[in-house]
């Protein structure tokens, strides 16, 4: 009997209930155990084909999604936007309908979240968000897996995101921790707080799970006693024209040894990568004893295998 995610789109963490987030985490844990037991290929998706569309460059997402598909027995077909007729003006709705006749799922990394929504509206196969300007759900699911592995639980864990609080990673992290009953703090300048609709969705989830949400402008105050300190780049892809303004606003939000010293004694540091050493994080922190970024990056593979299996395996 198909599970609760079978055949569904995944555009946002908002698409998942708390129980479904836990299902992804537990499935990912089992996938990872089997991987390290030597079961590298689990042919649950044998005969399936997955189209991967990239409007933005990618290292972790592209490689981990291709490998995830291959390890599940599926065939990934990877396209840059300029390799498709999208680049010559074909409407997204036409591309979505055509690809649906050839493949079993479409995953896309796009500049505008609206592109994903249009794709999902017209595709007759599941559509998966590999990153948009609004959210990065696959990253957040891998992050939740990482925190669970490192801390043994998530309920009540204090997770502090420091930096640009309205970027895609911050949005998805806020939502996933709220759905899992954690204590999520977003520390950012008032100009860069989370989008109102995302914050309201997180607050609604928190009412059900007992999670707590805080917006704290002062990073030192925010990080005090943190179990997890998380940051991301100050200038997201597509926002390069705002670089000077972002650096001015975020200068005091750098995660350095002084800031980490305010966190709990066993705090961990997380970053979705790529990192700009000397900007949002120092070399000493990302290469230091707090850092779990390489385990976090690996967990993209296991979390995405779980997502693909749950959506595509009947």
UniProtKB/Swiss-Prot annotation:
Domain of life: Archaea
Entry GO terms, CC: cytoplasm
Subcellular location: Cytoplasm
EC assignment: 2.1.3.3
Positions of carbamoyl phosphate binding: 58-61, 85, 109, 136-139, 272-273, 300
UniProt keyword annotation of Cytoplasm present: yes
PROSITE patterns per UniProt: CARBAMOYLTRANSFERASE (PS00097)
Pfam family, one: OTCace_N
Pathway(s): Amino-acid biosynthesis; L-arginine biosynthesis; L-arginine from L-ornithine and carbamoyl phosphate: step 1/3
GO MF terms, alphabetically ordered: amino acid binding; ornithine carbamoyltransferase activity
Alphabetical GO biological process terms: arginine biosynthetic process via ornithine; citrulline biosynthetic process; L-arginine biosynthetic process
Binding residues annotated for L-ornithine, in chain numbering: 168, 232, 236-237
Catalytic activity: carbamoyl phosphate + L-ornithine = L-citrulline + phosphate + H(+)
Similarity remark: Belongs to the aspartate/ornithine carbamoyltransferase superfamily. OTCase family.
Record key words, sorted: Amino-acid biosynthesis, Arginine biosynthesis, Cytoplasm, Transferase
Summary of the function given for this chain in its UniProt record: Reversibly catalyzes the transfer of the carbamoyl group from carbamoyl phosphate (CP) to the N(epsilon) atom of ornithine (ORN) to produce L-citrulline.
PANTHER family per record: ORNITHINE CARBAMOYLTRANSFERASE, MITOCHONDRIAL (PTHR45753), ORNITHINE TRANSCARBAMYLASE, MITOCHONDRIAL (PTHR45753:SF3)
Record's protein name: Ornithine carbamoyltransferase
């Amino acid at each position: 009997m198909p599970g609760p995610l079978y055949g569904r789109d995944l555009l946002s963490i908002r698409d998942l209930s708390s129980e479904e987030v836990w299902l992804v985490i537990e499935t990912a844990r089992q996938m990872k155990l089997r991987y390290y037991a030597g079961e590298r290929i689990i042919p649950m998706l044998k005969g399936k084909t997955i189209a991967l569309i990239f409007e933005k460059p990618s290292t972790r997402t592209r490689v981990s999604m291709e490998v995830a598909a291959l390890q599940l027995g599926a065939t990934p077909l990877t396209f840059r936007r300029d390799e498709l007729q999208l680049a010559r003006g074909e409407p997204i709705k036409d591309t979505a309908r055509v690809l649906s006749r050839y493949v079993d799922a479409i995953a896309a990394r796009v500049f505008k979240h609206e592109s994903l929504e249009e794709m999902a509206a017209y595709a007759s196969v599941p559509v998966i968000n590999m990153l948009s300007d609004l959210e990065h759900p696959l990253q957040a699911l891998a992050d939740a897996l990482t925190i669970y592995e490192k801390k043994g639980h998530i309920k009540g864990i204090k997770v502090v995101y420091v930096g640009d609080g309205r970027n895609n990673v911050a949005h998805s992290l806020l939502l996933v921790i709220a759905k899992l009953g954690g204590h999520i703090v977003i520390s950012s300048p008032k100009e860069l707080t989370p989008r109102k609709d995302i914050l309201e969705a997180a607050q609604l989830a928190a009412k059900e799970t007992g999670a707590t949400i805080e917006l704290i402008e002062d990073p030192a105050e925010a990080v005090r006693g943190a179990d997890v300190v998380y940051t991301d780049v100050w200038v997201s892809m597509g926002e390069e024209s705002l670089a000077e303004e972002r650096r001015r606003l975020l200068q005091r939000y750098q995660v350095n040894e002084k800031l980490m010293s305010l966190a709990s004694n066993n705090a961990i540091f997380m970053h979705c990568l790529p990192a700009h050493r000397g900007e949002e994080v120092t070399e000493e922190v990302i290469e230091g004893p707090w850092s779990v970024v390489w385990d976090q990056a690996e967990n993209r593979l296991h979390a995405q295998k779980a997502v693909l299996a749950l959506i595509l395996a009947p």
